[in-house]
Amino acid sequence: MKKYLYFALAVLYACSPALAQDDYPTETDLYVFWQPDRPLTPADFQKSDSLSDRQKRISDAHALYCVGCFGLWTQADAPKGKWTRKRTEVVYIAPAFEKKSSFILHGDTAGIVHEQLLFDLQEVGARLLRYKLEEIKKEADRAAGIQAIVLNTCKAKVREFVDAMSSSFVAEVLIEKNDSLARWRALVDDYLEKYADYATRSEDCARFALNRPLLNGYSSIEALEADFRKRDSSGTYMIKQGPFPDTGTPVYKNGKRGRHVPPQSSENDIRKE
């Protein structure tokens, strides 16, 4: 009887990390974080009823009646104690859509297809950033802390690319009103497919939705010392920590709000080699 009990417990333990991922919130009441099975909907554009007359005139002048607000969020968390090659920083990246700054006028829900493409462009940026960080880590022989050190520099370069692509799309499709939407959709889809291995995970979204580190024994990094070898008297790395902005109340796939998700054990590190 005992061996069956041990077997059942072993199966439960092996499955628990995968099952826990179903509990990760991928949005809040304020933000939607990019996921392949979560397209934007009219309900996500929550500023529609609170636009000023000036904003409405600007939208009418350019015939832009569906406008989303997007961002590319990043956060690095690090062990509070000793770092090793397998216990090092964890970088989270997620495209974010801000509900209360996005609007639809005159019932132009058809415009959501354009905003979804712009949201997908943010996901292209997220994947390119992960790819670049991974390449740098390989070149540095997987040195602990290297991704956190170069994160902001790499993000700035990716940000330039995404902004340029987004501006070109808006100019061609939304301002000039030409027929290049299909070409743009194909271009973005090609990027998403090419970098499919670097897609935004539910863990990335949950890091921002829950607004705290997901791993036990980890804390948020605001900035690292330029010389990463610098340590305090106890031998641990010196990390400057700072508060993270309010991201709202987590919304779970089962419709519940604010349900607690316990931190993972560092043994189940999602970046484990």
Model region roles, listed by residue range:
Residues 21-106, 119, 127-273:
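Extended, composition-driven regions rather than compact fold-specific motifs
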Residues 1-24:
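Bacterial Sec-dependent N-terminal signal peptides
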Residues 110-122:
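Active-site recognition of the HExxH zinc-binding catalytic motif
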Residues 7, 111, 125-127:
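A structural preference for long, well-packed, hydrophobic secondary-structure segments
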